[in-house]
């Protein structure tokens, strides 16, 4: 009597079926995806990174915003005609820059809630298949064309993707607390990393943080407040009420981890930090 297919085989069969039927607009099922809550930032994962933001293939993530529509070229043309570096960059380019980054996006709940609220803003965050499905479901109104995701090590390669002062918002939602002191170096907030966030964030842009771990909250607040490029946002900006920022409201309620904390009656600690103008050179 044959054995039942292994979980891995079931996952592969499910994913292959999705890829074969490009018109299938059903949302992907989480049970067929291995989603680790956290990844080791010090491991050398088999990932490809652009040499610089100019070499990043944004057109494949946001085809609706591509400078050159790839379907206009046949595969034969691309293979028979070698492209110079400038032409290759044009094929990868999009008509506007990504402005919102959710670092550590989980299942993408935050980004999918933000996308309709900021329809003209490109955002980056199991999720890529969900992006494809939502685009198909909303093809008539072109919704979710502004949302996408990629897997990358932010702690090592953030400036490879984003140029100076490109982003307007960075979200750090329920990051790994790394409780042990010897693991604190792996936390997504540190004085060194804050300098990288300051580099890619435009003056007036905001870093949003939320966690259910008070110790981590105090750590993030302490490190951002010590950094000369950031200042704490007003309490009204962070706290629930009429003056609360729209991004804070979505961050509190729309992430999967945030929903779980609400179900369990846990605390949510929010802190937001605004990028200040750089001082003039003497």
Swiss-Prot record:
The keyword tRNA processing applies. S-adenosyl-L-methionine binds at residues 104, 153-154, 173, 255-257. It catalyses: guanosine(46) in tRNA + S-adenosyl-L-methionine = N(7)-methylguanosine(46) in tRNA + S-adenosyl-L-homocysteine. Signal peptide: none annotated. Residues 10-22 have a biased composition (Basic and acidic residues). Pathway: tRNA modification; N(7)-methylguanine-tRNA biosynthesis. It holds the Pfam family Methyltransf_4. InterPro entries: SAM-dependent_MTases_sf (IPR029063), Trm8_euk (IPR025763), tRNA_(Gua-N-7)_MeTrfase_Trmb (IPR003358). The active site is at residue 176. GO terms for biological process: RNA (guanine-N7)-methylation; tRNA methylation. The keyword RNA-binding applies. Its EC number is 2.1.1.33. GO terms for cellular component: nucleus; tRNA methyltransferase complex. Residues 1-29 are annotated as: Disordered. SUPFAM superfamilies: S-adenosyl-L-methionine-dependent methyltransferases. Catalyzes the formation of N(7)-methylguanine at position 46 (m7G46) in tRNA. Forms a complex with TRM82. Belongs to the class I-like SAM-binding methyltransferase superfamily. TrmB family. This is tRNA (guanine-N(7)-)-methyltransferase. It comes from Phaeosphaeria nodorum (strain SN15 / ATCC MYA-4574 / FGSC 10173) (Glume blotch fungus). The lineage of its organism: Eukaryota, Fungi, Dikarya, Ascomycota, Pezizomycotina.
């Amino acid at each position: 009597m044959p054995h039942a297919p292994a979980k891995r085989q079931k996952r592969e069969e499910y994913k292959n079926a999705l890829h074969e039927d490009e018109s299938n607009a059903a949302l992907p099922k989480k049970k067929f995806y291995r989603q680790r809550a956290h990844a080791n930032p010090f491991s050398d994962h088999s990932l490809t990174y652009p040499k610089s933001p100019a070499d990043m293939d944004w057109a494949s993530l946001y085809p609706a915003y591509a400078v050159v529509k790839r379907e206009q070229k046949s595969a034969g043309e691309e293979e028979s005609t070698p492209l110079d570096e400038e032409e290759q960059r044009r094929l990868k380019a999009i008509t506007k820059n990504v402005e919102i980054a959710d670092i550590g996006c989980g299942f993408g709940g935050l980004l999918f809630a933000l996308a309709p609220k900021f329809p003209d803003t490109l955002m980056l965050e199991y999720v890529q298949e969900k992006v494809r499905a939502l685009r198909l479901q909303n093809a008539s109104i072109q919704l979710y064309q502004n949302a996408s995701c990629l897997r990358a090590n932010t702690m090592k390669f953030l400036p490879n993707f984003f140029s100076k002062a490109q982003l307007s918002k960075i979200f750090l939602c329920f990051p790994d607390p790394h409780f042990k002191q010897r693991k604190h170096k792996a936390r997504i907030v540190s004085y060194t990393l804050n300098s990288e966030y300051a580099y890619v964030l435009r003056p007036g842009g905001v870093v949003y943080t939320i966690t259910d771990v008070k110790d981590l909250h105090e750590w993030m607040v302490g490190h951002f407040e010590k950094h000369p490029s950031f200042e704490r946002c007003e309490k009204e900006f962070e706290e629930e009420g009429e003056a609360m920022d729209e991004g804070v409201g979505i961050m509190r309620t729309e992430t999967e981890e945030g929903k779980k904390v609400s179900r369990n009656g846990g605390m949510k600690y929010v802190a937001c930090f605004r990028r200040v103008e750089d001082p003039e050179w003497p």
